[in-house]
């Protein structure tokens, strides 16, 4: 949500999707962007159908953001990559910025990131953002990761209790149940604008391949 809000603050027309059938995250996307958003799911739709959804919904968009689900390669049954974020990136030819929880680790982060990149030759991972790190640590580890992994580190978010989405016994609160949700979005967006390289993300997005859309028969 922070990246979406930061992009919107730059007056970029963004369309957002959630990988998989999750209905809560798209509600947050709608709260941030003020437009209808949706889901892309390679379990329920093949590549052509997903292409048609994108063509239908993004005519006025300048940028499409797809939020992943679970671990990057985690798919159906917990033992496959089927319907994973990785599969969606392949189907849509989307460059991937990996979000990594960096709390409690240092050089091992480079090993984790490189391992994820090399697990599949076509991982499409071209950048990384670190979550839950201090500014001081980020300034030191950024160079290590870029040197070891060969991709840019596009910023970070510090650990901050105010960024957390309140939870309940059945899971995350829905946006219309959150008190001061607009303030929460603005807090995260302001942090993202300060610590995440939005211009770097836009440069990566500009390198996305053209997607060929097959008409429905």
Specify the residue positions occupied by each region the protein language model found.
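Glycine-rich phosphate-binding P-loop
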Residues: 1
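ATP-dependent carboxylate-amine ligase catalytic core
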Residues: 4-92, 100-127, 136-139
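Short hydrophobic alpha-helical runs that function as membrane-insertion/retention elements
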Residues: 96-99, 154-156
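Internal gly/pro-rich beta-alpha loop/helix module
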Residues: 106-216
């Amino acid at each position: 949500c922070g990246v979406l809000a930061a992009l919107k603050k730059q007056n970029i027309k963004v369309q957002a999707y959630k990988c998989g059938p999750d209905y809560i995250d798209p509600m947050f996307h709608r709260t941030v962007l003020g437009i209808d958003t949706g889901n892309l799911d390679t379990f329920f739709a093949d590549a052509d159908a997903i292409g048609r959804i994108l063509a239908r919904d993004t005519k006025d968009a300048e940028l499409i953001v797809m939020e992943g689900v679970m671990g990057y390669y985690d798919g159906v049954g917990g033992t496959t990559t089927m319907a994973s974020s990785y599969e969606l990136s392949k189907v849509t030819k989307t460059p991937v910025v990996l979000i990594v929880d960096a709390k409690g680790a240092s050089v091992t982060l480079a090993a984790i990131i490189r391992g994820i990149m090399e697990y599949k030759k076509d991982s499409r991972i071209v950048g990384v953002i670190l979550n839950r790190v201090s500014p001081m640590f980020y300034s030191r580890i950024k160079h290590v990761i870029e040197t070891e992994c060969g991709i840019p580190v596009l910023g970070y978010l510090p650990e901050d209790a105010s960024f957390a989405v309140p939870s309940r016994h059945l899971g995350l609160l829905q946006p219309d149940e959150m008190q001061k949700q607009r303030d929460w979005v603005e807090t995260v967006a302001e942090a993202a604008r300060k610590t995440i390289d939005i211009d770097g993300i836009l440069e990566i997005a500009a390198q996305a391949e053209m997607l060929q859309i097959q008409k429905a028969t």
